[in-house]
């Protein structure tokens, strides 16, 4: 659960906050309750008290136009409604009654010199990533030709060896063994590596390899968008493998269908070349070029002409 103190600490470089009141409530939770990040923070809104309230110059001018009694009434309703925090943008100085009420209700009140619109934009981006649905999957995540590729399969099939071969061919490692995936936008899944395993690749017989040290800075990536899953299967698993799928195979990942390719592992097969070919073919499909569909149309035309 994200707290106000975490929000302050995580954004210290971009948004310098100063505590005014309610510091004892620094551990107050910021709950998403299924809401989008855009709904978790915004300009002062008395109708939606459950989001982070931002006071800009216009909001503070509107608030101070009320008499003291009416201000206290509205603010009491807002604070009792479960507001996570109140943020004053543009370096504004709050009226004393606002400070007193935040202290009384133990609601964090903070100030920052950042402009209100910029503050909201920065926090929406931050909250969208921080509160995004996440999962951890077993596999190797790579940047292959600019496409985020997740290699999966049962243990012992050579996922790490395949990743090492692809890295030696100029592609980049994102994560090995434990891949953290986050749905940061409605149609975007980002994958990254846990801090503990960054730059490391485990290969049977060699142990842990520091890819960044061995291959250089350009051999690793911090994050990539997941676009393709390459699933390795044993050559004996005929019941799980379709030689020529007529429809694209997809796998559900955090509620999104991700394109999936299945490759058989057998002696003499160059899997690195096959993965590169699968990625190039996926790029063509993303551009609207369907090789199998074009072939089937060509075949239908040939059958039609031969029947005349």
UniProtKB/Swiss-Prot annotation:
Give the matching CDD domains. Answer: HprK_C
Which residue positions are annotated as catalytic? 138, 159, 177 (proton acceptor), 243
What ranges does the record give for the region Important for the catalytic mechanism of both phosphorylation and dephosphorylation, renumbered to this chain? 201-210
Matching InterPro entries, A to Z? HPr(Ser)_kin/Pase, Hpr_kin/Pase_C, Hpr_kin/Pase_Hpr_N, P-loop_NTPase, Ser_kin/Pase_Hpr-like_N_sf
Q: Which residues bind ATP?
A: 153-160
Which residues lie within the region annotated Important for the catalytic mechanism of dephosphorylation?
Answer: 264-269
Query: Which Enzyme Commission numbers does its entry carry?
Result: 2.7.11.-, 2.7.4.-
Q: Does the keyword Transferase apply?
A: yes
**Which reaction is this enzyme known to catalyze?**
[HPr protein]-L-serine + ATP = [HPr protein]-O-phospho-L-serine + ADP + H(+); [HPr protein]-O-phospho-L-serine + phosphate + H(+) = [HPr protein]-L-serine + diphosphate
Q: Which residues bind Mg(2+)?
A: 160, 202
Tell me, how does this one assemble?
A: Homohexamer.
Misc: Both phosphorylation and phosphorolysis are carried out by the same active site and suggest a common mechanism for both reactions.
User: What biological function has been recorded for the protein in this entry?
Assistant: Catalyzes the ATP- as well as the pyrophosphate-dependent phosphorylation of a specific serine residue in HPr, a phosphocarrier protein of the phosphoenolpyruvate-dependent sugar phosphotransferase system (PTS). HprK/P also catalyzes the pyrophosphate-producing, inorganic phosphate-dependent dephosphorylation (phosphorolysis) of seryl-phosphorylated HPr (P-Ser-HPr).
Similarity comment: family membership: Belongs to the HPrK/P family.
Record's protein name: HPr kinase/phosphorylase
Q: Which organism is it from?
A: Bordetella pertussis (strain Tohama I / ATCC BAA-589 / NCTC 13251)
In the UniProt record, the gene name given for this protein reads hprK
